[in-house]
Amino acid sequence: MKKHLIVNGCSFTEILSAHKSWSEWLVDKLPGYSLSSSALGSQGNGLISRGIIYEVSTKLKNGVDPKDILVGVQWSGSDRMDFLLDDNQLQQAKLDRSKGMWDSNPDTNWDGWMENPTGFIPSQPKKWVISNLGWKLAKDFYMKWHSPQFGSVMTLEHILRTQWFLERNNINYFLFASYSSLKYY
């Protein structure tokens, strides 16, 4: 029976780039495994967690035995946030890729490789906006509402939610952080 390596993370895990990510090296060493990745450069830990839970749930609903699933999660920086917007908010935010890239469009944060807004369910509209500390898009949020402590608490909650889900479903997993972002736990 086919086995599944399901991974998620940020650019360090993303498999769309020119470099070979750790997950591609790992699946080469795991005979009989296929690789499923929803990693995306700059995405935060909320979308990483949700993407893993969605992908594992889909495999289980399709009859895959939990023992045939291995999950690898690379946690991103705790200052990376994601927000689910409705159609009106997306329109107000003017998040329109056709308007151009970072330098020519102050309302966006793309530099040519990032998908924003994005999503983790392939059949659903992409309404999750990812943001980072240095992006113009989220400048007000980070100045007024974000702190390193908040980022650490949110990251720990995403980690726990993911662990609890995987353990409840008897899924083998490994987790690691690519940044030393949990300074305040």
Model regions and ranges:
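Serine-esterase "nucleophile elbow" of acetyl-processing enzymes
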Residues: 1-55
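Alpha-helical cap/lid subdomain in secreted, periplasmic
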Residues: 54-185
